[in-house]
């Protein structure tokens, strides 16, 4: 019988990471104890409480801990953003490089900014099929449906009802 219990314990040990032969002691302090009182943190907890014991509003906390760290030495405000480093310090060769931006040709500029009406035949050499929006545009608008379609017929019927002088909405009594 003793042998059977030992085999059972061995079987449990092979499946679980708990040693059945070891005796575990209860930890101290227990999580069930009042840890604030045990470690003397109750006065700090009361100073940070949002409500007092009588239910009235306590100290309104700021979103920062500025009030709580004022007694510590040093600066308590964040210094403004970093100042930009001049490009000459980052790459000294930039200052030695010549300015390579050239002026635009005035004639080219005037031709490029001339606004004329588009010819009746459209812009020469321009094909709207190259943009690949022609098919999608007609699908979005519904231009590709003929009037004999199911949806086209419904639209025309609704228009005819409205044209006959009858109100298409129901009147509630």
From Swiss-Prot:
Its main location: nucleus. It is found in: Nucleus. Component of the Mediator complex, a coactivator involved in the regulated transcription of nearly all RNA polymerase II-dependent genes. Mediator functions as a bridge to convey information from gene-specific regulatory proteins to the basal RNA polymerase II transcription machinery. Mediator is recruited to promoters by direct interactions with regulatory proteins and serves as a scaffold for the assembly of a functional preinitiation complex with RNA polymerase II and the general transcription factors. One of its GO terms (biological process) is regulation of transcription by RNA polymerase II. Belongs to the Mediator complex subunit 19 family. It comes from the Eukaryota. This is Mediator of RNA polymerase II transcription subunit 19. GO terms for molecular function: transcription coregulator activity. GO terms for cellular component: core mediator complex; mediator complex. InterPro entries: Mediator_Med19_fun. Residues 139-173 are annotated as: Disordered. Component of the Mediator complex. Keywords: Activator, Nucleus, Transcription, Transcription regulation. It comes from Scheffersomyces stipitis (strain ATCC 58785 / CBS 6054 / NBRC 10063 / NRRL Y-11545).
